[in-house]
């Protein structure tokens, strides 16, 4: 009985090694709505724990705060200065418009509220591209900052 169990275990291990890679699930190329919401929730928790450390992690893309085309952005809730963003750090959020002219930054600055997650839709190119695509960002106010994470539709 013990020998038969050992044989089955060895046989299963060999089969697992021989499985073609294409049968295994691949990570999607782009982030999803659910992943964007989850990243924002983790970002809020990190900000509540230590906002200085959290902002540094967001900027460096550490701690799982940059994944494919998902990233955290944060702006000072008073003056709108982006303190965390992969390439717009130091810009004023209220001045940022989508590629079709929508004032998404102004909306985020005016409507962000502590404890409430809101959504804005605009057109923005994926990192590394010039082609604008429909993008949705979830955002909230936390520890004196308006923070968000966006994902692309389609």
Question: Which residue stretches match the model-derived regions?
Answer:
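Localized chelating/binding microdomains
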Residues: 7
